[in-house]
Every structure is written in C-alpha cells, then in structure tokens.
C-alpha cells in the first residue's frame, strides 16, 4: 500500500483550477503552494491518496465550486470540503469559534472510514490548531507549516504604531499565537521555507524545537514559468491591451509588483519612492498587479485602505500615464506578464515588510526577470542561491530608491541576473525536486512514528449500555443543585435509564468523588473523569484507564511546573495535598484576575513544559499535561466506545466550562450559570435553560 496523506488548509478560497489569488487577504500564495504540493504529491508513485480538507462555503458572492463537498484534483487527489461555522464566506479571523467543530468532524470521518493517513500536514495557524487536536486524539504524526506567523505579525504591527487592542480586535492575534504554540507542541516535524524563518521567527515561540525543523523551499512549475525572448503574438496583444489604458509608453522597462492589496506587502511605499524619483519615472513604468476587483469600495477594509493610498499617491505625484493598476487579469496571464516585463529589461520588485518565502520571486526569476526585493525573510535564501538581483531595506526609503535606480542602470548586469535566475530556479527550486525532497524527509523523520490510534483494551468492560451519555459536574452543578430528587427520579426511570448513561466530571480523587457522590443517591455512573481530566475510572473499578494515562503523560514534568510557577507566589498558592495528583498541580488564586491564566500559560511555554493551565470558578487553577483536559477525556471515551459526539450531553455552568461546550457535543447551561458562558448563546448545540430544573429541561430534547 502506498502513502496516504492529509493536508489541512481551512481559510481562503481554494479549488483545483482558476485560483482566485489576490481576491482577498486570505487567498494568497499559501493557497497556491498547498494546491501545487498536493498535485505534486499525487503524481508520485509511492503515494496512494492525498486529501486536502478545507471549508464548505455556500455563498452567492463566491463561485458554487466552493460548495462542492468533494472535488477531484486527479485520480488519487481530492479536495474534501466540510461544513463548519457560517455557511457564508468569512475572513479567517472569524473562524476561531468553530475550529473545534471541524476537528471533531475530521476525527469522526477518519474513524468511520477506518483509513488513516500516514501523516497530517497543517497549513497556517488555524489548521495547526485543528491538526493538533486530530493528531492527539488519533495518534497521527503532525507536520506543521505556519506560512505567516502571529508573533511576527504582532511585532511588525506594533512597530508601525498600531495599538495592541486594535490589533487584537482586527486579527484575533492572541488566538492565532496560542494556536501556533499548540501546533508546535504537537508537531513531529516543522517545515519551513528558509533558515531565517526558522531561526528568527519560529524561535520566538516557547514550544519551538529546532530539532523538529526541516527547510524545504517551495517549487515553481517550470512548465508555466519559463524564459522566452517573446510571448506569442496573442499574449503580447492581450497584455498591451491590459496596460495601454494606463501607460503612455509601453516599451519603457517596467518595475513590476505582483501581490495582494494588504498592508504587509507595502505597495504604497513603492509608489512613494517612484513618485519622488525623477530618474525612476524617466526610465521606468510602474505596473501593479494587486488582485482583481470590480469596485474597490466593496472590498474588505484593509484592501480598500491600500487602494485608497494607491489612488491618492498616483494623484499626489501626478503619475498618470506612468503607473498601471488594472482591475482585472487572468491567473494564466501571470507567466506572460513576467515575460512581457523581462522582454523590456524590467525588474520585479517585492517591497513587502516581511516575506516568509517569496514564491513570486521564483516565478519572476524562472521567466528571466531580475528582482529588487525586501531583505526580510525568504528572499535572502533565494538570492543567495540564484544571484539574480538586489536585497534592500524597504523600511529605508532612500536605500530602497537607490537600489532600484542602481539595478535599472546597468544592462550588462541585468543580463547576468536574468540568466542566473533562470538557471538558479531550475537547479534549486523545481516542484519535482521539492516533492521528492519532501517525501524523503517525511519518511525518514516519521518512520519511527507509525500511527498508533487508540488501543481499545477490554472494551466490553468499559462500554456503557446506553446509546447516549450525560456528563454532570460533581464539584459545581451537583454541589449546588436543588433538584437532585427530581433528577434522581428521572434517571431511575427504566425507559430513560436503558437509553442514557451517566458520567461524572470532577477535580477530586476517585475516592473523594465516590464519597461525595454517594450523598446524592443518584444512579451509579458508567464512568468517572477525575482529577481535572487526568484520570478515568469505569463504574466500580478502582484502577484508572492506563491507555488514557499513557497518552497524556508524554513529557509531563510535575516538579518543573511547581518550580516555574513558584515565582508567581504573590498571585497563586498551592492547594493542600488532598487536592494534588500525579498529573495535576492545583493552585488557589489569592485574588481573581483575568490576567493570571495568560501569565501562567506564558511561563509554562517559555520553559518548554508540556503543560496546560485551566482556571475554574475564577479561583481554582489546575495545571495538567498538555494533552489532558475534561473535554479531551470525553473524546477519548467516545472513540473507545464508538459513540458519536452528538450522543454526548454535558452540563456546563461555571467559568472554565467553555472547553466542554466547544465542538460537536451537546450542552445544557442552567439558568444560574456564570456569565462567562453567555458567548455561546448563538451555538445551535447549546441549550440555555431558563428553568430552575435546568438539566431536566434540557433532557427533554436529548
């Protein structure tokens, strides 16, 4: 049997043909890279199947292609579209609340098919989050590529003077960084494009490990991007028609920029330099390919702002007849545009503030078009191998201008750069070489990490009789419930008891939990999830589930946790010994504060500890292994039992119970719940009861 591979690319618009690159800030080079990688892998003889999972979109504003659940790419490659979040197309920052749904759907889909991939490759932070959850639940190796990192984005935006609260509101930057940290913690392999990306960007993350890194530069499709003295007559005619409405002299060497209209690409700075330089205006046209648009007023805010700057700068410097920014172009025209510019001895310009890799640089080089590019990120590696242009500090406008003026002044040097680029891309950056290197490195790295999936053990002794299960919180809901007698009668009803089993969630030990539970006189539970999700017991058994224990205790260091958090003694104090456990360190906050949880999380990450903090009822902080939680324990149980998550009902009432509500499980939230749970009111699977007998009220619809 050949390799089975699963790629996750969740946001943006992706299909097997006619990619809408540059349509918005979410549909950029990452989309092209992922699609080309999937196609390249599918063409390899050692690969049996490649699946690319993305979001199913039903929205009249976008093509119906994106509502097709399964799209064939080739005989052994498919795009699988799964629904999560709104039906309409939304920007990636609005998808965070729904990623747990997708993780649950992927796990259920793989379990149902019983055909597991040899590895998962997650692209970008959102897919990294989902990939980490799927990896931990099914024991599958995870490969992660961040493409563009949250910490780097935050650094640049703060340096630009943007307020942190505004950054958070616009980009959900803390969620993105948290997701990247989670992905890095679970990754068996981190694929980067450049050494700089690894050493200067990923190294800022607490859970980054350099030993997991492999540098595999992306490739270029040399069947599309190649050097030629002239385009076909039809191509030449089409491009002349595209640019002639803007340019007085089509034969001037162009300065060509191709990017999305987003701030990071720094296009206004390029226009500013061009507008200030009489030499550049005399010698060159400026051509800006910034995606396609119908009406710039209808674009998303960031794109509108960039185009407004473009229009204003062209007007400010009276650049009419010298600057082209066509509204529409076809993706298949891009190689011809590079060749059109190269024929006129032009330059490709990348003014981005940072460039994780720079695929357009390779495309231009393959077409014989030299470059002047940002010195931040991937371009360093590309130019060190191809020697086909200049690196410049794009934040220094004078240095940037000097670089452009110098690069365009020497035709002999231009020819050398042109030839070097064509040869360098062919030697170092072909897709064949990329895919071959990718598979070889994966197999070498992951051959000792065969998918383990969950070992079922003696499932007959642990499988509940009923087809559904309800989880109650012993420490909060049952402590405070005034309706125990009614609940007891309901659960003791024979017709109900044959259908619904009972599970108990608690931070207590199994001994203390059973002692307290006996006072409720409720029916015997089928399962106990104890010590904040770190221990699982079945019925009357006194020995915890060893399979669960083995899966969560990877790299656990209890003493390390206590040592790292000791210097937070002004905010935290260890609880007494009866509240501690081998895989749980329990603290009491001296004063409730929303700042404590992020602070503890940061300290644990910075120390490289595989641990996760959970705050309950605003006062009680438990630090447990990274792979452990009450929600993860429930998912482990459903996998062992073969029970659909839709058949699980969880009662959530307190601060800290949000983890129980996310995903495909159903939830009841009683009327006297903590206000921190109100944000889930829009969730279809969450029932907010207005009755005092909240659980009984919710059970009517379960």
Regions found by a protein language model. Name each.
Residues 1-362, 366-450, 454:
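Catalytic cores of nucleotide-sugar-dependent glycosyltransferases that transfer UDP/GDP/TDP-activated
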Residues 113, 183, 341, 463, ...:
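Structural alpha-helical scaffold elements that stabilize or flank donor/cofactor-binding regions
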Residues 122, 144, 192-193, 373, ...:
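Short beta-strand scaffold positions
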Residues 465-483, 661:
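Asp-based phosphoryl-transfer active-site loop
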Residues 486-577:
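Active-site phosphate-binding/coordination module
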Residues 508-527, 591-612:
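Substrate-recognition/cap helix-loop segment adjacent to the acidic, metal-dependent catalytic center
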Residues 531, 537-546, 550-551, 612-645:
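Substrate-recognition "cap/lid" segment bordering the active-site pocket of phosphatases
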Residues 624, 631-702:
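Mg2+-dependent phosphoryl-transfer enzymes with acidic/Ser/Thr/Gly-rich catalytic loops
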């Amino acid at each position: 049997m050949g390799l089975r591979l699963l790629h996750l690319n969740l946001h943006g618009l992706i299909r097997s043909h006619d990619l809408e690159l540059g349509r918005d800030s979410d549909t950029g080079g990452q989309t092209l890279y992922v699609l080309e990688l999937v196609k390249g892998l599918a063409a390899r003889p050692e690969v049996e199947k490649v699946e690319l999972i993305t979001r199913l979109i039903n929205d009249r504003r976008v093509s119906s292609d994106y509502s097709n659940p399964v799209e064939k790419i080739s005989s052994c490659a498919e795009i699988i579209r799964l629904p999560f979040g709104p039906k309409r197309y939304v920007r990636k920052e609005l998808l965070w609340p729904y990623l747990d749904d997708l993780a649950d759907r992927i796990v259920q889909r793989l379990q149902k098919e019983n055909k597991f991939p040899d590895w998962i490759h997650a692209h970008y932070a959102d897919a990294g989050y989902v990939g980490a959850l799927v990896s931990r639940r099914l024991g599958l190796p995870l490969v992660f590529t961040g493409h563009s990192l949250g910490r780097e984005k935050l650094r640049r935006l703060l340096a630009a003077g943007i307020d942190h609260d505004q950054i958070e509101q616009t980009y959900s930057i803390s969620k993105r960084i948290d997701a990247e940290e989670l992905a890095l913690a679970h990754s068996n392999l981190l694929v980067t494009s450049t050494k700089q990306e690894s050493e200067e960007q990923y190294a800022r993350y607490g859970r980054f490990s350099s030993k997991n890194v492999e540098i595999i530069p992306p490739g270029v499709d040399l069947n599309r991007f190649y050097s030629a003295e002239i385009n076909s007559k039809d191509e030449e005619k089409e491009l002349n028609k595209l640019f002639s409405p803007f340019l007085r002299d089509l034969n001037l060497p162009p300065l060509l920029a191709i990017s999305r209209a987003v701030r990071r690409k720094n296009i206004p700075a390029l226009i500013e330099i061009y507008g200030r330089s009489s030499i550049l205006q005399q010698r060159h046209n400026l051509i800006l390919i910034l995606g396609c648009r119908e009406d710039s007023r209808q674009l998303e805010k960031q794109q509108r702002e960039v185009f407004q700057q473009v229009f204003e700068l062209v007007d400010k410097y009276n650049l009419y007849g010298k600057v082209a920014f066509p509204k529409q172009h076809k993706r298949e025209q891009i190689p011809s545009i590079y060749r059109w510019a190269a024929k006129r001895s032009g330059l490709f310009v990348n003014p981005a503030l940072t460039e994780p890799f720079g695929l357009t640089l390779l495309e231009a080089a393959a077409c014989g078009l030299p470059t002047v590019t940002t010195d931040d990120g991937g371009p360093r590696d590309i130019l060190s191998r191809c020697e086909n242009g200049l690196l410049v500090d794009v934040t220094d406008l004078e240095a940037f201008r000097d670089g452009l003026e110098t690069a365009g002044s020497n035709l002999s040097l231009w020819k050398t750069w042109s030839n070097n680029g064509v040869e360098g891309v062919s030697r170092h950056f072909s897709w064949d070489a990329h895919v071959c290197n990718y598979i070889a490195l994966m197999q070498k790295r992951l051959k000792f990490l065969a998918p383990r999936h969950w070992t079922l053990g003696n499932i007959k002794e642990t499988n509940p009789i009923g087809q559904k299960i309800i989880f109650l919180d012993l420490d909060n809901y049952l402590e405070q419930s005034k309706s125990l007698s009614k609940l007891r009668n309901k659960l003791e009803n024979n017709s109900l008891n044959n259908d619904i089993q009972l599970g108990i969630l608690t931070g207590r030990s199994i001994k203390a939990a059973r002692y307290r539970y006996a006072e409720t006189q409720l029916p015997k539970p089928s399962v106990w999830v104890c010590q904040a999700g770190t221990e699982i017991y079945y019925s009357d058994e006194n020995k915890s589930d060893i399979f669960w224990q083995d899966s969560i205790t990877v790299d656990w260091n209890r003493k390390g946790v206590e040592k790292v958090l000791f210097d937070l003694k002004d905010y935290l104090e260890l609880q007494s010994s009866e509240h501690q456990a081998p895989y749980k360190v329990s603290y009491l906050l001296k004063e409730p504060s929303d700042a404590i949880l992020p602070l503890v999380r940061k300290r644990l990450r910075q120390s490289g500890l595989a641990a996760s903090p959970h705050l309950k009822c605003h006062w009680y902080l438990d630090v447990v292994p990274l792979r452990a939680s009450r929600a993860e324990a429930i998912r482990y149980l459903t996998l062992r039992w073969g029970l659909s998550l839709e058949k699980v009902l969880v009662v959530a009432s307190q601060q800290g119970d949000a983890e129980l509500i996310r995903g495909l499980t159903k939830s009841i939230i009683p009327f006297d719940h903590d206000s921190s749970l109100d944000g889930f009111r829009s969730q279809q699977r969450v029932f907010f009861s207005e009755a005092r007998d909240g659980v009984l009220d919710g059970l009517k619809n379960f």
